[in-house]
Amino acid sequence: MAPSRNGMVLKPHFHKDWQRRVATWFNQPARKIRRRKARQAKARRIAPRPASGPIRPIVRCPTVRYHTKVRAGRGFSLEELRVAGIHKKVARTIGISVDPRRRNKSTESLQANVQRLKEYRSKLILFPRKPSAPKKGDSSAEELKLATQLTGPVMPVRNVYKKEKARVITEEEKNFKAFASLRMARANARLFGIRAKRAKEAAEQDVEKKK
């Protein structure tokens, strides 16, 4: 294989009858068929639940490089479920993924996922455990007739881009230093506690000097 990208140029040392140790990939097409059959079998087994599994939350990708994009996460946090009014044990039984390790670090993410849960709950057709004795919250007989298995992801997460109209760049925007501003904001956030502590100590020393 030809070297790709900025990696080290390899010097392969072929000894010990290397032709018998070549990694082959002849099972690839059969493995593809096997995966497809497994997906179809699972879809039949869990019908009429969605074939792609439970609903996932909207999360932001980590690091500065990717945090402008959103994607589907692992599971909803316990706080999101509490605000949406869904018990964590009930959530898993009605096709909602739960991740107790996740923490909400912003109000926006919390509100977005709570709204997502409420929308999902409004669209959900819930089958009664006993058809003869439906409980509160179960769907009506008319709604049950409309139920079909969803094949794609449940409420897929999409990145929405808002196009801006072309306009003249202002002088203020030309003089604005984006990178320096971000670095300064990060430095201020990092040093906030240390600066507050130093200011408090300086104030205490001034009080002692006045005495």
Swiss-Prot record:
Example GO biological process: bone development
Cross-link (Glycyl lysine isopeptide (Lys-Gly) (interchain with G-Cter in SUMO2)): 123, 145, 174, 177
Gene Ontology cellular component terms for the protein in this record: cytoplasm; cytosol; cytosolic large ribosomal subunit; cytosolic ribosome; endoplasmic reticulum; membrane; nucleolus; nucleus
Record Gene3D superfamilies: 1.20.5.110
Subcellular location field: Cytoplasm
Position of the signal peptide: none
Modified sites of kind Phosphoserine: 52, 77, 106
Name of protein: Large ribosomal subunit protein eL13
Organism the protein comes from: Homo sapiens
Gene transcribed to yield this protein: RPL13
